[in-house]
Amino acid sequence: MAETKYIFVTGGVVSSLGKGIISSSIGKLLQARGYNITIQKFDPYINIDPGTLNPYEHGECYVTVDGMETDLDLGHYERFTGIQTTKANSLTTGRIYKAVIDKERHGDYLGKTIQVVPHITDEIKRNVKLLGKKYHYDFVITEIGGTIGDIESAPFMEAIRQLKWELGKNAINVHLTYVPYLRAAGELKTKPTQHSVKELQSVGIQPGVLILRTEKHLEQDILKKVASFCNVDLDCVIQSEDLPSIYEVPVNMQKQGLDTAILRKMGEPIGETPTLGPWREFLDRRNKATETVNIALVGKYDLQDAYKSIRESLSHAGTYNDHKVNIKFVNSEHLTDDNVAEKLAGQDGVVICPGFGQRGIEGKIVAAHYTRTHDIPTFGICLGMQMIVIEFARNVLGYADANSREMDEKTPHNVIDIMEEQKNITNMGGTMRLGAYECVLKQGSRVFNIYKKEHIQERHRHRYEFNNDFQKEFEKAGMMCVGRNPESDLVEIVEIPGLKWYIGTQFHPEYQSTVLHPHPLFVDFVKTAIENKKK
């Protein structure tokens, strides 16, 4: 393709309709046709990034390979397409305004009055086109967070309007709306969609494709009505019914011709429809799995999206082990020595989840003690790894006051300590150890046999690390340090070889698990949990 084409995905009526899944599905379908694609997310909030946002409000913070803290939708982009994202794939209003203000302070605008139009909108447009220009992508898919009509989205909508005018057929808007079903009347209502499209048209944007989220199947007469009232071609009105799995969405979208509609509207040749072979094989294997394995997630956040990547990674691993993974959430705040046996009863494996702060950590330590002493397969991730280290120090090494400097600055047995380069940092946002770092695995260790190689790269998001001063004591007592960063000499992985599966990673392996390439640690963990269930 001579020129990069741009697809803008917007949403209307209500939030949380699944724009991220639709964007990922479009990317997957175009990728299957041989196009070079990327997906980016523009969030209208004023935070610089989601790194300091409450997981209860916004779900997990996803980390890119180059260390950008981003929205969880970037996790969907990577899991669907297998393409790694970077800082350029995530943008917020905060970053846009900061860039413009920094330029103004530098004198780049030569004394002009800085306004939303053109300066903010120009900066948005520059960032939209940045990836296409730099990497010569065939398609850049840009998801706009929020809902049409939100006051904070206005500059993004104006930027899209301008880009559609400037780029002509090389730009298209895909608008996702909701068609509610009124149970009392027994009717599906299209009026909210009509109003949403009118709102979009009022800012100068005509959607090229409409996707209707619905709980009930939409008959042809409803689709014709929407097409007529919204000035959209009938073959460009697509319905997105609720499905058992988000991974069925690309197949459903292909069946209705979403990719062909986009290509036709943008003047691209249609060609043969891809078979989506490996993707369909994954779905077939997933649907044929009848047996289940029970995995408990021990953490302090009740919102499911707070552990989105872990849940999806377990799901991938279950499929490749021909099992469905039944996930039980166990709130670590309410976990005690008295109730841990009851709370973890019937669980074939336990993940001790990441997090920050004091709240809920003693419950995680209780869980780590129970799973270690009862030989239940256990996977500690980030803070979870730190908790299994603290539990071991308290109950095996005999340091009853062992702790992390994060929780107790005065503990004499600081088995988890703050990294040297973090000691003088006061800002919270974007200052942790972030992104991919190299790790060298100890030959003969369980993790070495799982990865089947010595050198790996995994993504991090933390300030605290295993304290090397205690390494000899830990290893003498049976907890081995089996993964280490060669540059900083930081311990990245610990394991207890004498147990079925007791591994802690300071990094977040869940960020690198995709549909077609599940993460080896999760695959082996679930495999061991299945074996544990059978025994």
Q: Residue ranges of each PLM-predicted region?
A:
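Glycine-rich, charge-decorated loop segments at or immediately adjacent to ligand/cofactor-binding or catalytic sites
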Residues: 182-189, 386-395, 496
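A generic structural signal for well-ordered coil/turn residues at beta-strand boundaries
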Residues: 3, 206, 233, 291, ...
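Cysteine-nucleophile active-site neighborhood
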Residues: 17-20, 24-28, 32, 343-438, ...
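Active-site proximal loops enriched in glycine and acidic residues that flank catalytic Cys/His/Asp
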Residues: 11, 41, 214, 241, ...
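Flexible phosphate-sensing "switch/lid" loops adjacent to ATP/NTP-binding sites
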Residues: 1-325, 333-349, 356-357, 363-370, ...
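C-terminal and late-domain segments of enzyme folds
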Residues: 434-438, 442-535
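Short beta-alpha connecting loops at secondary-structure transitions
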Residues: 57-65, 243-247, 352, 373-379, ...
